[in-house]
């Protein structure tokens, strides 16, 4: 906006990109609202620095916006849409990034202390490493209209395209209290930590049996199906058993696959009421056998968890039926 012909570009403040990629991004910080600035990209070569064209602008302060108001804007979109202004949002990380029961680069962020729906969203940036932030961190995020995008993705409000360098940690260890809801309210509370009570499952199982493969489990809660999703990256759930139980509770992030509601446990603490602490039979294959009237023989393979030195014990069978344990996992 002013005269930039006399700027000594060799001696101005320079900020290097965090990664040598093309294209690259750099956060320009410390600007004063209302002041005019000139900026240009540069690259360092073996023969010295080379410069791009000069761009000028007047700095303006981002507008503070509540998470609830931003969620309202996001829900009004039908496709990926640039945000309409520079914004600053502040909230509490309510998922557990280190447990990774979410897509890589996902942060679930909610309004501090919120107990009503529409107070959380997803921040998505694959340059954010799981160990960078923790459950209970309070963060402030600057969203630039030139790059940040908003959309409803898998029924959840999501922001992408922001610069990871403009995520500032304000505090840590804040209390995150799940909201007790029913299964039919999961989509309303998308991205928020919730607790479902009166949960039942008739058969024990394993949360995640394969290292790089996601899994889903169907529980019942007050007569409704409750789908529990474990992401392929959630390694803390690998080969961890859960027990058959009536009237337990499960906690996690309210989420969805497309429009089908799911619960995403943030960590093993969220599923502790179904923890298998002793020897547990997790599956029998085949799960059902049928014999002809002339009789017959079938082999059953028993899968267990926490078996240790315990052995399989058989209960008495019906008249004319007998069984024996062959090698502690085969009947």
Question: Which residues does each predicted region cover?
Answer:
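Short, surface-exposed linear motifs at loops/turns and structural transition points
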Residues: 1-61, 280, 290-300, 310-316
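Surface-exposed loop/edge segments in extracytoplasmic proteins
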Residues: 3-16, 116-119, 224-227, 319-324
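Surface-exposed coil/turn segments at beta-strand junctions on protein surfaces, enriched
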Residues: 19-21, 32-34, 82, 134, ...
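Surface-exposed loop/turn motifs at beta-strand-loop junctions within extracellular Ig-like
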Residues: 43-47, 145-147, 256, 306
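Acidic surface patches and DE-rich sequence motifs
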Residues: 45, 220-221, 326
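OB-fold nucleic-acid-binding modules
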Residues: 60-280
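Core beta-strand segments of extracellular beta-sandwich domains
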Residues: 198, 296-305
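Surface-exposed binding patches on compact interaction domains or structured appendages
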Residues: 280-283, 306-331
């Amino acid at each position: 906006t002013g005269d930039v012909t006399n700027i000594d570009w060799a001696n101005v403040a320079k900020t290097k990109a965090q990664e040598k990629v093309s294209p690259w991004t750099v956060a320009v910080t410390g600007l004063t609202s209302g002041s005019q600035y000139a900026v240009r990209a540069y690259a360092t070569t073996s023969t010295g620095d080379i410069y791009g064209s000069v761009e000028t602008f007047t700095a303006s302060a981002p507008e503070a916006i509540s998470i609830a108001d931003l969620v309202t804007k996001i829900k009004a979109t039908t496709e990926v849409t640039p945000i309409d202004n520079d914004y600053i949002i502040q909230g509490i990380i309510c998922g557990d990034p280190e447990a990774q029961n979410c897509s890589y680069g996902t942060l679930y962020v909610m309004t501090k202390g919120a107990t009503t729906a529409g107070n959380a969203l997803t921040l998505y940036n694959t340059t954010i490493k799981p160990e960078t932030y923790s459950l209970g961190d309070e963060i402030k995020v600057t969203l630039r209209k030139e790059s940040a995008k908003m959309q409803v993705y898998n029924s959840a409000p999501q922001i992408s395209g922001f610069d990871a360098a403009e995520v500032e940690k304000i505090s840590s260890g804040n209390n995150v209290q799940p909201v007790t809801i029913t299964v039919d309210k999961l989509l309303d509370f998308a991205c928020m930590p919730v607790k479902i009570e009166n949960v039942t499952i008739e058969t024990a199982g394993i949360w995640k049996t394969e290292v790089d493969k996601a899994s889903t489990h169907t529980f019942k809660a007050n007569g409704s199906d409750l789908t529990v999703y474990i992401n392929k990256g959630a390694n803390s759930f690998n080969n961890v058993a859960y027990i058959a139980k009536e009237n337990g509770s499960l906690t996690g992030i309210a989420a969805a696959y497309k429009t089908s509601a799911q619960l995403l446990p943030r960590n093993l603490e969220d599923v502790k009421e179904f923890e298998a602490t002793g020897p547990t039979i997790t599956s029998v294959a085949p799960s059902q056998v049928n014999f002809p009237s002339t009789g017959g023989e079938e082999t059953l393979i028993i899968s267990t968890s926490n078996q240790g030195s315990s052995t399989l014990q058989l209960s008495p069978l019906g008249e004319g039926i007998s069984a024996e344990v062959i090698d502690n996992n085969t009947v």
